[in-house]
């Protein structure tokens, strides 16, 4: 693959500040221009162009067959592209396909000419061959073919880049039953349980947790920045309990446990339908002057998809179900929404489900329903009141064909809040990352991928603390978590909470060696 790309791009790279290194096309000004040009690049295309992977095989045939439907669907979703961009993408694809067919035909003819010349050389001595009109004609035709290919390869590379830089921004197709519009148009599918009743005004989770000294979020801007937090004692045990409760349930149901890297290349993010180069982005980018193209994952979905990237699985092993607990990092934009509390934070622990299925919507849709059923089972066993939403077109992002969210009731906030999400990405991710399965006959086909939240710890902590709070300030522990905490109630701590001794306080304590104030 790399050799083929180098051969074809050779005449083109010289004029673009590139040189060939070890079979790859390498930009000598890459590190110098990374910070300023990164947002204009497509790492997924570059990854393939440099020979590390095959080019994404987008389903352009379906798009070209029903362009009007694709254009309507494009306008109903959020994203950079609109229906007016579609004709240009299609025409570029068609031109590229015709050019590749022309190149393929010439390459086949070139091979045939080479074989014919070789046969003449074998059957005649050198002096006879040089005088043979057929030999001279074949040599002339060979030179003409090479000349044509030398002109066509750069054109192919230019069209290829033009196509992929736009086509890779196209979203997945949309399920016909998905509601149209923004999040306000979400369709309620199920409502489970009842709102907890209180004989007092319910408090918010942060007020509850600070009095129990199990969450600390104050005075951390100089320690770990805004939207960070500490969990202590029962707070930490609640996190471990939620993670272990979820992992145990899913492993018992046949899921394979995984751990994944927190640092991943941008190509994996883009293959999953995320944009590490967006401005602003929710993805933390590691300093490119030291570590070229490394990013902190905001979900284990990225690492799990990367595990299957450029690999095939056996058909008999489908569907594959993976589960992973990881720390997630998200650069939440400073919109002023939820500035305090655990609802929007920069780091949190989450258990993620990830599935790989065979082709066809039936199999991936069944797995999506299975994941949703497991989510509902987990929340039901935790005793939470929640509702299941069929998310509308503008909430699907790039990769989702269909997406279900679950919102749990949070009494202190006085409203529902999202706690889980489940998406069927069909073959959107697999076509970009080459996640495939091998049939019994040995044929490779693109798989479908499905992902779902198993347990997002901070938001479940909100729902649990606010739903199980008591008038005396204690919090009941749901039976499902009691084995992990060793108690049925979280009560006021027996220890003395930390006392702040830093600046900006009304009455400062006397430090060692400091004279008493008069």
UniProtKB/Swiss-Prot annotation:
It comes from the Eukaryota. Its main location: mitochondrion. Residues 1-34 form a transit peptide. One of its GO terms (cellular component) is cytosol. Gene3D superfamilies: Bira Bifunctional Protein, Domain 2 (3.30.930.10), Serine-tRNA synthetase, tRNA binding domain (1.10.287.40). Pathway: Aminoacyl-tRNA biosynthesis; selenocysteinyl-tRNA(Sec) biosynthesis; L-seryl-tRNA(Sec) from L-serine and tRNA(Sec): step 1/1. Pfam families: tRNA-synt_2b. ATP binds at residues 330-332, 345, 418-421. Residues 497-518 are annotated as: Disordered. It catalyses: tRNA(Ser) + L-serine + ATP = L-seryl-tRNA(Ser) + AMP + diphosphate + H(+); tRNA(Sec) + L-serine + ATP = L-seryl-tRNA(Sec) + AMP + diphosphate + H(+). GO terms for biological process: mitochondrial seryl-tRNA aminoacylation; seryl-tRNA aminoacylation. The modification N6-acetyllysine is found at residue 110. Belongs to the class-II aminoacyl-tRNA synthetase family. Type-1 seryl-tRNA synthetase subfamily. NCBIfam families: serS (TIGR00414). Homodimer. The tRNA molecule probably binds across the dimer. This is Serine--tRNA ligase, mitochondrial. It comes from Bos taurus.
């Amino acid at each position: 693959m790399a050799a083929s790309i180098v051969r074809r791009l050779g005449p083109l790279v010289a004029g673009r500040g590139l040189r060939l290194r070890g079979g790859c096309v390498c930009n000598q000004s890459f590190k110098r221009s990374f910070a300023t040009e990164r947002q204009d690049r497509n790492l997924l295309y570059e990854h393939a162009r440099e020979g590390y992977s095959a080019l994404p095989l987008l389903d352009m045939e379906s798009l070209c067959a029903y362009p009007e439907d694709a254009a309507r669907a494009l306008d109903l979703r959020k994203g950079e592209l609109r229906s007016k961009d579609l004709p240009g993408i299609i025409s570029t694809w068609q031109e590229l396909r015709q050019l590749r067919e022309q190149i393929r035909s010439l390459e086949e003819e070139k091979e045939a000419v080479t074989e014919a010349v070789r046969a003449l050389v074998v059957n005649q001595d050198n002096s006879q061959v040089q005088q043979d009109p057929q030999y001279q004609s074949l040599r002339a035709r060979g030179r003409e073919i090479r000349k044509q290919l030398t002109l066509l390869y750069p054109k192919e590379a230019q069209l290829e880049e033009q196509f992929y830089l736009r086509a890779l921004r196209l979203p997945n197709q949309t399920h016909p039953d998905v509601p149209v519009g923004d999040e306000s148009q979400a369709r309620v599918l199920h409502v489970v349980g009842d709102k907890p009743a209180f004989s007092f005004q319910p408090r918010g989770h942060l007020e509850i947790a600070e009095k129990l000294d199990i969450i600390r979020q104050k005075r951390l801007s100089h320690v770990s920045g805004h939207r960070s937090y500490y969990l202590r004692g029962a707070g930490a045990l609640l996190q471990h309990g939620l993670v272990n409760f979820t992992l145990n349930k899913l492993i018992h149901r046949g899921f394979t446990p995984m751990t994944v890297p927190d640092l991943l290349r941008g190509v994996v993010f883009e293959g999953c339908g995320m944009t590490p180069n967006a401005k602003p982005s929710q993805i933390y980018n590691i300093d490119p002057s030291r570590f070229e193209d490394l990013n902190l994952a905001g979900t284990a979905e990225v690492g799990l998809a990367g595990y299957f990237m450029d690999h095939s699985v056996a058909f008999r092993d489908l569907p594959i179900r993976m589960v992973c607990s990881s720390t997630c990092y998200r650069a939440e934009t400073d919109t002023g929404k939820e500035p305090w509390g655990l609802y929007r934070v920069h780091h949190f622990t989450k258990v993620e489900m990830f599935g790989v299925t065979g082709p066809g919507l039936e199999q991936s849709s069944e797995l999506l329903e299975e994941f949703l059923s497991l989510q509902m089972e987990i929340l039901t066993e935790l005793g939470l009141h929640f509702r299941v939403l069929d998310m509308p077109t503008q909430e699907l992002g790039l990769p989702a064909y269909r997406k279900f969210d679950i919102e749990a009731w949070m009494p202190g906030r006085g409203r529902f809040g999202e706690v889980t999400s489940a998406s069927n990405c069909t073959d959107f991710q697999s076509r970009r990352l080459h996640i495939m399965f091998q049939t019994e006959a040995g044929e490779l086909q693109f798989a479908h991928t499905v992902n779902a939240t198993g347990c997002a710890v901070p938001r479940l902590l909100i729902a649990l603390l606010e739903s199980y709070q008591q008038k005396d300030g204690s919090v009941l522990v749901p039976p499902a978590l009691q084995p992990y905490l060793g108690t049925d109630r979280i009560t006021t701590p027996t220890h003395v909470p930390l006392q702040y001794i830093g600046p900006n306080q009304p009455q400062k304590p006397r430090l060692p060696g400091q004279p008493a104030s008069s």
